[in-house]
From Swiss-Prot:
Lineage: Bacteria, Pseudomonadati, Pseudomonadota, Gammaproteobacteria, Enterobacterales
CC annotations in GO: cytosol
Gene Ontology process terms (BP): mannitol catabolic process
Organism of provenance: Buchnera aphidicola subsp. Acyrthosiphon pisum (strain APS) (Acyrthosiphon pisum symbiotic bacterium)
Protein name: Mannitol-1-phosphate 5-dehydrogenase
Coiled coil region boundaries: none
Protein encoded by which gene: mtlD
Record EC number: 1.1.1.17
Length: 385
């Protein structure tokens, strides 16, 4: 069995590539970083340190190779593999779709009918379904029947924390023991691959939003609040009592939306929040706030980790004040090394805060949602001082 993994970063190597290799796949990584591509091809293996609650261990990941995403030979690889996975970030999916489309055309022209399943592992709800629509848009209509018969696009939810830690070995990674990979079993074409610890669900939306509204929401809010106070790591941020209360309360507010929407058990969900907090506190998984907070425009989109639960609270007439504080902190964020942060700050300066919120978050003009964010923005430094 062969798999092509787009993205050889932390999640790509430390979670997906590792899991696929442990499941017996030969894994080909595709990335635009030629240094990483060369390192994988030179070593043909890499090491991952797993941080557990009781003990740590290091595992050796074998059967790996790599190719640059711009290499024309990638279409041949796409036509021959059994599985494609991605961990490139939601904004890069459209570029990946163009590459996949060329591979599918090559597969069709060579009359290959072996089913191919594609799992986009991104922080975007139904990212594989989105990827499918982009592929269909670029694929000639005469090939659509082939795609619908032989190409599966499987939506999923992934959950793990892999911090950015500087190592002498460019391929070495440190990961947490906790990992979750839940997929929609109904979307596979052909035989369902046997992948270690992969879970199947018929109600994937609930699990996708549970992870997005809890881990991602809490992570982002802790980062943006922490950066205002010049903290460096997630552990520093949640050690601050005021920030800790806001983050925990925001996660409970987003949790109330999940409980209402999906009929989750309240006590079970509070336990889930507690587990997330314990993961944030793990000193061996120290994660830099600048990494967590990067790309604020993406994180402030209507369907992402901050605005979506916030709007859910309005939808069900539930508390939202701490979510609003977190969103306000995101608009406060400025990092001269982050292009999206620079664009965000420039928009606030030129167009004003209100217009920027309306545009980026796709919120109604003169709405309570917008004014609640503005209110918290004007108070944010006093709140966490």
């Amino acid at each position: 069995m062969k798999a092509l993994q787009f993205g050889a970063g932390n999640i790509g190597r430390g979670f997906i590539g590792k899991t696929l290799s442990e499941s017996g796949f030969s894994v080909i990584f595709s990335d635009v970083n030629q240094n990483i591509v060369d390192a994988i091809n030179y070593n043909r293996e890499y090491f991952v340190k797993i941080i557990g609650s009781n003990q740590n261990k290091t595992v050796n990941i074998k059967r790996v190779s790599a190719i640059n995403s711009n290499d024309s030979n990638i279409k041949k690889i796409i036509s021959s593999v059994d599985l494609i996975t991605t961990a490139v970030g939601p904004t890069a999916l459209e570029k990946i779709a163009l590459i996949i489309t060329q591979g599918i055309i090559f597969k069709i022209k060579n009359q290959f009918t072996k089913p191919l399943n594609i799992i986009a592992c991104e922080n975007k709800i139904k990212s594989s379904s989105f990827l499918k629509q982009v592929v269909l848009k670029n694929l000639p209509i005469k090939y659509h029947d082939y795609l619908n018969k032989y190409i599966g696009f499987i939506d999923c939810s992934i959950d793990t924390i892999i911090p950015a830690i500087n190592n002498k070995d460019d391929l070495f990674l440190t990961v947490e023991e906790f990992k979750e990979w839940i997929v929609n079993i109904n979307q596979f074409k052909g035989a369902v691959p046997k992948i270690v610890d992969m879970k199947f669900s018929n109600n994937l939306d609930a699990f996708i939003e549970r992870k997005l509204f809890t881990l991602n929401t809490g992570h982002a809010i802790a980062a943006y609040l922490g950066l205002i106070k010049n903290y460096k790591t997630i552990q520093d941020a949640i050690s601050d009592k005021k920030i800790r209360v806001i983050v925990r309360s925001a996660m409970e507010e987003s949790g109330s939306v999940l409980i209402k929407r999906y009929n989750f058990n309240k006590n079970d969900h509070l336990d889930y929040i507690e587990k997330i907090f314990l993961r944030f506190e793990n000193p061996f998984l120290s994660d830099k706030l600048e990494r967590i907070g990067r790309n604020p425009l993406q994180k402030l989109r209507r369907e992402d980790r901050l605005i979506k639960p916030f709007l859910g609270a309005f939808e069900y007439n539930l508390p939202y004040s701490n979510l609003a504080k977190g969103i306000a902190a995101a608009f406060y964020y400025h990092n001269k090394n982050d292009l999206e942060s620079i664009e965000l700050s420039s928009s606030i300066k030129k167009q004003g805060l209100e217009s920027t919120i309306i545009k980026i978050c796709d919120l109604p003009v003169n709405s309570k949602e917008v004014y609640s964010i503005i209110l918290e923005y004007n108070l944010i430094k006093k709140i966490i001082r």
